């Protein structure tokens, strides 16, 4: 498997040109070797300093002929299992990569935000806390995140369990597990367990 993500201890996990290339590289690596991709996220969105061109005359954006940075992301979703974990604050571009997965889990101390409270205040003149904007309670209800984990270790175990149910790629079968459960067994409990709201 391939493991990637953002590290908050390095420039707040803010993506710059090199960081984005690394994210794309992990996706391309998973596609090349046809193995599951795991992303561990704890990072902010783009930094103002990262887009500042005063220090260099070189352009910071991609050339027009450069392939979209989301092509490899879309391809992984069609070819290999993608599991992600929010292990702290996740905002901006890292948040989009977090939710673009087959399985996502969020720890108690994590946040998933497109933008923070200051941006909301400026745009809508509404005071809101980070937790009310993007905490686990919000996203478990909205369907942005699949599961909740009390700790990082719990999140890792949930990812491990998820990966045990799926094949390594679209060209292989999942592992066959012996069971005493009857093939023709029906359970009415499933009618209530599966939410009618497709976003949950």
What is each stretch, according to the model?
Residues 15-16:
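Conserved N-lobe beta3->alphaC-helix segment of eukaryotic protein kinase catalytic domains
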Residues 1, 7-12, 150-200:
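Intrinsically disordered, low-complexity segments enriched in small/flexible residues
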Residues 35, 41-171:
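Conserved catalytic cores of soluble enzyme domains
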Residues 1-7, 22-53:
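A structural preference for short, pocket-lining loop segments at secondary-structure junctions
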């Amino acid at each position: 498997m391939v493991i990637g993500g953002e590290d908050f201890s390095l420039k707040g996990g803010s993506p710059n040109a090199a960081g984005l290339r690394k994210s794309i590289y992990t996706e391309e690596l998973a596609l090349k070797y046809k193995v599951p991709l795991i992303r561990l996220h704890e990072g902010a969105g783009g930094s103002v300093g990262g887009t500042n061109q005063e220090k260099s005359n070189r352009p910071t954006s991609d050339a027009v002929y450069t392939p979209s940075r989301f092509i490899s992301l879309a391809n992984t979703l069609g070819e290999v299992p993608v599991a992600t974990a929010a292990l702290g604050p996740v905002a901006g571009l890292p948040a989009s990569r977090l939710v673009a997965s087959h399985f996502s889990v969020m720890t108690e101390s994590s946040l998933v935000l497109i933008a923070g409270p200051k941006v909301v205040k400026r745009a809508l003149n509404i005071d809101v806390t980070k937790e009310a904007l993007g905490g686990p309670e919000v996203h478990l209800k909205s369907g942005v995140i699949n599961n909740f984990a009390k700790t990082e270790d719990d999140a890792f175990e949930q990812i491990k369990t998820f990966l045990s149910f799926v094949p390594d790629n679209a060209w292989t079968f999942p592992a066959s597990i012996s069971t005493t459960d009857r093939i023709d067994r029906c359970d009415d409990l499933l009618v209530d367990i599966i939410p009618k709201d497709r976003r949950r």
